[in-house]
Amino acid sequence: MSKEIIAKAQERMNQSHQSLAREFSHIRAGRANASLLDRISVEYYGSPTPLNQLAGITVPEARVLLITPFDKSILKDIERALNASDLGLTPQSDGTVIRLVIPALTEETRKNLAKDVKKVGENSKVAIRNIRRDAMDEAKKAEKAKEITEDELKTLEKDIQKVTDDAIKTIDKMTADKEKELLEV
């Protein structure tokens, strides 16, 4: 019983780490990265379609994203979606491809992005602590139902806390690495 509780908590914490990594990949660090466009949807035949399903996205230079639509007729729709997005980038079209030039980040922008990174990291820690609370509650229920002894409960609580501490350390490291990446010029 105790192994299942820990395994379940660990799995949920790993999912939280993956979610954090995805969030961090969407925060631009002054370099071109195709994952910046993962959240962009384009109206295509009346339904929102992810941009990466409608166009090839390449990184020809460090600060340039090149978007090559599979169907040239949707070029304007892609431009419209990029302009409406919260990326703050202006698409440049030459009729066949769209270029997105990623500007160098100003010091102020870097600091604001670093604050965002801290906030996202903190939210992730809250999620981890909620997972710990759920696991602790589950362990206490198991003890009340006489599925585990009081000694096993104490051991299980220590194990859950250790898994939680490891998960928080991982989040701290991921957050610090992303901040460092943002703040280096």
UniProtKB/Swiss-Prot annotation:
Any Gene Ontology CC annotation: cytoplasm
One function term, GO molecular function aspect: ribosomal large subunit binding
Gene Ontology biological-process annotations: translational termination
Keyword line: Cytoplasm, Protein biosynthesis
CDD domains given in the database record: RRF
Entry keyword annotation includes RNA-binding: no
InterPro entries for this protein: Ribosome_recyc_fac, Ribosome_recyc_fac_dom, RRF_sf
Predominant cellular place of this UniProt entry's protein: cytoplasm
Subcellular location: Cytoplasm
SUPFAM superfamilies in UniProt: Ribosome recycling factor, RRF
Role noted for this protein: Responsible for the release of ribosomes from messenger RNA at the termination of protein biosynthesis. May increase the efficiency of translation by recycling ribosomes from one round of translation to another.
UniProt record similarity statement: Belongs to the RRF family.
NCBIfam families assigned: frr
Record's protein name: Ribosome-recycling factor
